Amino acid sequence: MEKKKKPELSRRDFGKLIIGGGAAATIAPFGVPGANAAEKEKNAAEIRQQFAMTAGSPIIVNDKLERYAEVRTAFTHPTSFFKPNYKGEVKPWFLSAYDEKVRQIENGENGPKMKAKNVGEARAGRALEAAGWTLDINYGNIYPNRFFMLWSGETMTNTQLWAPVGLDRRPPDTTDPVELTNYVKFAARMAGADLVGVARLNRNWVYSEAVTIPADVPYEQSLHKEIEKPIVFKDVPLPIETDDELIIPNTCENVIVAGIAMNREMMQTAPNSMACATTAFCYSRMCMFDMWLCQFIRYMGYYAIPSCNGVGQSVAFAVEAGLGQASRMGACITPEFGPNVRLTKVFTNMPLVPDKPIDFGVTEFCETCKKCARECPSKAITEGPRTFEGRSIHNQSGKLQWQNDYNKCLGYWPESGGYCGVCVAVCPFTKGNIWIHDGVEWLIDNTRFLDPLMLGMDDALGYGAKRNITEVWDGKINTYGLDADHFRDTVSFRKDRVKKS
């Protein structure tokens, strides 16, 4: 697929970049005092325009592609759902992980064989993690059209939300895609999105079947009561659920994808409790985001389907919405945060202007880097090339991607007492958009033999090394754990929110 021409960089310019004048600019963003904040802000604003691709999906598929059933994920499939705990007792994987968390607290550990300052610190990390999950668990991230992840706003009464009576039933007053895109992206930022993009709904990435529970089963009684329910598209006016199906209207044409950033320092302690905590808080933020944005869209006269982790494949939607590119580890790597984001999406019939996918060299870089595969504790990440053939039931064949062993990945979670995250922590792009400055993107995309040099510099400077939890607790923390320069790097004005194709 054709993409926008990259800036030219001569051999002489490259020499200056590495050994001369440009070197200071290159190294400065790694933490040297005096880094040019104005230039950094300018570059961040230009990233997506600079790396925009032509219209269409950058995801390569063949005729073997079929919609993927959610039950095939390692989290839910019978072949991977049960894992032994540290005593050898076989349980659902998350219960075995809970046992390990308790063992670590009692032994004064922040993670697997990682001593805490004291038992109090060990407990504090797990307490923060457990608190972080509160909204996610209670608002029903796991199951579609359950609890507060409803496909309609019927149970969210006007009394509860202080909305003018009938606002959600009033026909749309605005149908202009440009105006509506501006409104919805503003609302998305207000609802907590650190990144937001729009894509045309590609049904290939919607699950063929969802994993859910019967509507009359309380969440606390849902264990072992999950059922599979097909997701189908039909000529219906609104999203509905029957006894047999979850039905998305054929008029559902757009998906809004949001990235919710995690705290970098906390994630870089992985696989420790603090990495689990920033993950947990992001999942709860995802739930709140979906609830708020869906209600805004409904009050504008359109329908909206929340999803968080469910309904479809978040990474594929994020790639097509221009948030980033798919990576070797399987996550979406964004220019601003690397893979250190969680993704959620909202499906709607609201007319919107789609964003263009971007290409800033992630595929070429991942082909050579392999740092996530090298550091993966379970060796679940492949060091081989991308293929169309899945390696197990958990992979989707027919899509060109790195095919990883997600059963191995999940198997390490009970051992570590958490959700690992080592691949995200060690990824060079997790440091943020410094890898997009001063010609580095040109080197990655055009000079593949230099990729090992970039990785070597990354290792030599100590990036990707595990952070100490005590230092993180004693360090500075901003609201929601966001980095100090967070909003400068993600600011979006109207002219940036709406780009006509």
UniProtKB/Swiss-Prot annotation:
Binding positions for corrinoid per the UniProt entry: 74, 207, 309-314, 329-332, 341-343, 394-401, 419
Residue intervals of the 4Fe-4S ferredoxin-type domain: 356-386, 420-439
Biotechnological utility: Chlorinated ethenes are widely occurring as groundwater contaminants and PceA may play an important role in the degradation of these chlorinated environmental pollutants. S.multivorans enzyme can dechlorinate PCE in the presence of oxygen concentrations equal to or below 0.19 mg/L, which enhances the applicability to use S.multivorans for bioremediation, e.g. at oxic/anoxic interphases. Higher levels of oxygen impair PCE dechlorination by inhibiting or inactivating involved enzymes.
Keyword Cytoplasm recorded: yes
pH dependence per the entry: Optimum pH is about 8.0.
NCBIfam families (UniProt xref): RDH
Subunit structure: Monomer.
Protein known as: Tetrachloroethene reductive dehalogenase
Organism name: Sulfurospirillum multivorans
Gene name for this UniProt entry: pceA
